[in-house]
Amino acid sequence: MDTAEGTAQGGVDTPGITGLGHDVYEIDTRMAGYQGITAGYLILGERPCLVETGTAPSAPVVRDALAALGVGPHDLATIVVTHIHLDHAGGAGDVAAMFPDAEVVVHERGARHLADPARLMSSARMVYGDALDTLFGTMNPTPAERIRTVEERGTVDLGGGRRLDSHYSPGHAKHHVGLIDSVSGDLYVGDAAGVYIPETADLRPATPPPDFDLDTALGSMRMFASLRPERLLFSHYGPVPDVEETLARSAEEIQLWVQETKAARGARLDFDHTVALVHQRTRERYAALGPDADRALAAKFETLSSTASSVAGIVHWLDSAPQPS
């Protein structure tokens, strides 16, 4: 394997690749052609590991980025996805085909959907309609014999005594794991801590149906804090060094959105008006949605974490498990 050893911390001289230190590289996987929406991470070493594949159309982007970092088709040891949503694992089957020696690691509750994504794709089609093809493409199966599952805890061997320890972190999804690097202290948080916009340092919840659950989401934030990571690596998007403050903000934002959604529901508003009211009452918290914000940035924020999706998840949770008034 030709490694990227000796390159600057900013990464190799390739757009979309950023070196983060400790042989960790952020890869912009360019969901639907957007920049800075979905990140994958490559950990170089004796056993190179890719965390998150992005969507199916992102697979060639990932392959080319790994090639630029010296990782050839038979060099990648492991592909890990934090959960099976299409912006994180939609490309798992395609990337696995491009790197035929890599095992694919996923929480046990998501494994069957990687092996046979038909039901997942059908559900996504109902939500996104024709936009599914543009946003996510078609998820292809991952051979079942190449899938390794983790449960409450798990380990990915990175070689040389280095490892990723997985920790079950539901709340956003029932098949979600966080992963902490034993050397760098980086914690890969997937969507469990929400969506981060590096341009404005905004942090907003990601609470889609059908799996959102307030108590487990807050429990995952507490668990993440107990791991005492050095840095958070968001799939949307990038590294955040202020760990304690960011996890506290994440918990605060989730609780605020639940509170506002409850209030709108208490006023007997229909779904569309609930979404509009929650958007109105929360938007001033986010610089990306301010009156002077760049419209493209605002559109990117809404693509990453739409108000309608998050409110729908909270409404589903409220309806499924009625809360005390």
PLM regions with names:
Residues 2-4, 263-325:
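C-terminal regulatory/interaction regions
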Residues 5-6, 12, 55-57, 75-87, 113-170, 174-244:
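Metallo-beta-lactamase
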Residues 13-69, 73-75, 179-191:
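Conserved beta-strand hairpin/beta-sheet module of binuclear metal-dependent hydrolase folds
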Residues 90-99:
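Metal-dependent catalytic neighborhoods of phosphoester/phosphodiester hydrolases
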Residues 215, 220-279:
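Active-site/pore-lining binding-face segments in mid-to-C-terminal subdomains
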